[in-house]
Amino acid sequence: MGTQKPRILPWLISQLDRGELEGVAWLGESRTRFRIPWKHGLRQDAQQEDFGIFQAWAVASGAYTPGKDKPDLPTWKRNFRSALNRKEVLRLAEDHSKDSQDPHKIYEFVNSGVRDIPEPDTSQDNGRHNTSDTQEDTLEKLLSDMDLSPGGPSNLTMASEKPPQFLQSPDSDIPALCPNSGLSENPLKQLLANEEDWEFEVTAFYRGCQVFQQTVFCPGGLRLVGSEAGDRMLPGQPIRLPDPATSLTDKSVTDYVQRVLSCLGGGLALWRAGQWLCAQRLGHCHVYWAIGEELLPSCGHKPDGEVPKDREGGVFNLGPFITDLITFIEGSRRSPLYTLWFCVGQSWPQDQPWIKRLVMVKVVPMCLRVLVDIARQGGASSLENTVDLHISNSDPLSLTPDQYMACLQDLAEDMDF
């Protein structure tokens, strides 16, 4: 027998009716519109009471226990916003979150009668609550307790189910400036800019022997192909894997590798969509992927997923990476992984040495390597001269440790989880 978690709408209505939280209030006698303070956490004038509604929901939902858990303002705000955004009876009427004097948002019930939802009994779970309520509670708990590991589900359909609306969303929390950092703007936000291209280091191995390495900027993404021609009509810059006959001496192995390359067809496509890296196979041979160390893939266990055919699949999410990087700097975990490994034409080497596989390809997003290096060295200003972020059109980076942390936290609030 446990305590039932409150539902967001009845709980929020009760908070509005009480009027005890600073800035949280009904607008007008009809009580269909209300305002929520929405001050950025890095503003110099930010006070604890500015985030009262977010903390109160974190406590009520069981995501935060005062005195036990570490306060996490960005996560509280994201969870609260996500809970509201999932409600079809609510809409964001006005966004004044960039107002320098009074940052806030105004929400509106699209059905005037919905605000009369009764507050559920939260004393003892008597097992008689509505099935839909149970599903809602379970979903919200899964979302709040989710382990945001970098390896997202391989069957994510990014293009149709999760478009990168967070890039220039009107509901974005990030202001034009990066407060408390002494910077006029956050240079790390270039990572999400539509017009910016990431630089990738691509390395290919045939039976464990490195046969190819190239560092490229690829507008529209890249495609690993096995022939010179490929299909020029497909998007992404084709990167041809080398003829195995030029580097392998075993003829039987050479023949097998050539067979795999011939089945690549249109290639293995990899591109960035906002905070995601997406992949799709355009040929017949299966491709499995996993996040691992730069020096070797994560063998000994199953792959993180299989690259889907004829649709997009998410293979890397920048959001959890940034969150884990912040936690690493705080000393609470190891540095996050960022290297993508692909096993082409064969099953993932979970029970065998990876060097036994015919074709393995490693892809390193150079900007993520730089971010981890900065964290390990205690700030970009601690490295020699300035740091290249390895993004097209980006300026050299030089940040103190405090500036770097502030920019990471600022960037994290721009993420969609």
Curated annotation (Swiss-Prot):
N6-acetyllysine sites (modified residues): K362
Residue numbers carrying Diphosphoserine: S382
GO molecular function terms listed in the Swiss-Prot or TrEMBL record: DNA-binding transcription factor activity, RNA polymerase II-specific; RNA polymerase II cis-regulatory region sequence-specific DNA binding
Residue span of region Disordered: 111-134, 147-170
Phosphoserine, modified sites: S14, S97, S123, S184, S381, S382, S392, S394
Function: Key transcriptional regulator of type I interferon (IFN)-dependent immune responses which plays a critical role in the innate immune response against DNA and RNA viruses. Regulates the transcription of type I IFN genes (IFN-alpha and IFN-beta) and IFN-stimulated genes (ISG) by binding to an interferon-stimulated response element (ISRE) in their promoters. Acts as a more potent activator of the IFN-beta (IFNB) gene than the IFN-alpha (IFNA) gene and plays a critical role in both the early and late phases of the IFNA/B gene induction.
Subunit structure: Monomer. Homodimer; phosphorylation-induced. Interacts (when phosphorylated) with CREBBP. Interacts with MAVS (via phosphorylated pLxIS motif). Interacts with TICAM1 (via phosphorylated pLxIS motif). Interacts with STING1 (via phosphorylated pLxIS motif). Interacts with IKBKE and TBK1. Interacts with TICAM2. Interacts with RBCK1. Interacts with HERC5. Interacts with DDX3X; the interaction allows the phosphorylation and activation of IRF3 by IKBKE. Interacts with TRIM21 and ULK1, in the presence of TRIM21; this interaction leads to IRF3 degradation by autophagy.
Family affiliation: Belongs to the IRF family.
Protein name stated in the entry: Interferon regulatory factor 3
Native organism: Bos taurus (Bovine)
Gene name in the database record: IRF3
